[in-house]
Structures are given as structure tokens and as C-alpha cells.
Amino acid sequence: MRAVGYLLVFSFLATAASAADYDKTEKTKAYEIRLRIAGAAIAIPKLRDEIMARFKKDTKEIQELSTSDLKEMPQYFHPYAFDADWKVTFENDHLISLSSNNFIDENGAHPNGAFDSIVWDKRTSRVVPFHELFAPGKAPAAFKAIAAAARKAWIKSATEKAGDAPDDSEADQGIGADENKLGHYALTYAKGDTKANGIVLLYGPGEIWAHVLGDFRLSIPMSVFREYLTPAWRAEFK
């Protein structure tokens, strides 16, 4: 019994440790890169590996360019930086959605930002592409409806930020009826719910529009695209 007890305690401690938030910084004279990941994602090995791979890809150029710039023009140099902070936007027993608002400083006039996101199916251990939410042949119509709602949300947000209504065509720079022109999508939910209530489309400052406008987080309620969802995905939304 004592051995079993120790085994159970060890198992509990291992699970708790695996669910701890991850926070690691690498700092040199040329750059400082930091990666933070919510414990819920760290507890899923393949998801953790996906995030680590993205971070490695995103920081490769930062590391190379900063090291080169420090060597070639030290008098004008300040360290480059990249900070990714992955947070959960929704989770239930078989899905988890995360987003990261990345801070990027490449020794330019000002730092930049860029979002990234992942919707992960725990059952199949893979990223869910946006179009897979929709029934066969329905994705184009779904993206058209989502783009229309996103355009309205962007114009409202841009007007509030700038004080004047932008030209409607400005929205088209980053919004279109194509999953590659709908930012980075993540699932959203109301506190206490176990089902999603919509999606959010994420755009970092300077990623598409003028940096001075900051980032855009365009909330799209499920009612906009409900009719296009597969039966399985319809069941995931409230």
C-alpha cells in the first residue's frame, strides 16, 4: 500500500508540474527573447511542441540579424527583442484555443507587434484550420459573412481610435472573404460556459494597418456564421 501511495503522490506531483506556466528568457548582448505559455498548453506535449516550433521559427531571424547588426554597427545598436505570451482564450475537455500577442523590437523607429493563434483538437492532436469549422462547400459563404461583420467592427474600432471615420476601403487592406485575410482566429466564450460563443480575429499593431492605430481584436458572434458550421462544430458553440 505504501508503494502505491508513493506512486499516486508522485503521479499527482508530475501532473501538477506539467501544468505549470512556462516562462523562459534568453538574453545576449544582441537580443532578448522570451517565451511564455499557459500551463494548460504545456500539459499537452504535441501542442507545446507546436508552440515551441513557431517560436523557434519566429526568433531565428531576430537572432541572426541582431548578431550581425551588433558586429557591423555597434554605435547605432540597441538589443533586439521578441516576447511571445501564449494565453488560453477557450478550453473544454476536447478543445483548447490560444492566442499570443507578440512584442517585436528590431532596432527600428518603434517596436512592432504581431498576433498568432492556435485552435487545437485534443482528440486528434492537431491544429484546426479555420475552414474546417464549416461544412463542405460552405467555407466561402462563411468567410464572406465573417468578413462583412469584421469590416463593420474594424471601422467602428478605427473610428474610436482615430476620432474620425476611416475610408471604408482601408478595411479591405486586411479583411477579405478568405481565411488568409481574416487575421488570426481564436475561439471565445463567456465566463462559466463550457461552449464557445464566437470567434475573435486578431491583428497586431502595424501588422496590416498603421502602427499608430494599435492592435485590432474583432469579435464575431456565432450567429454570424452558425448556419455554415458542420454539425460537430455547431455543437461546440452556444
Labelled PLM ranges:
Residues 18-238:
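Compositionally biased intrinsically disordered regions enriched in Thr/Gly
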Residues 5-15:
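Bacterial N-terminal signal peptides
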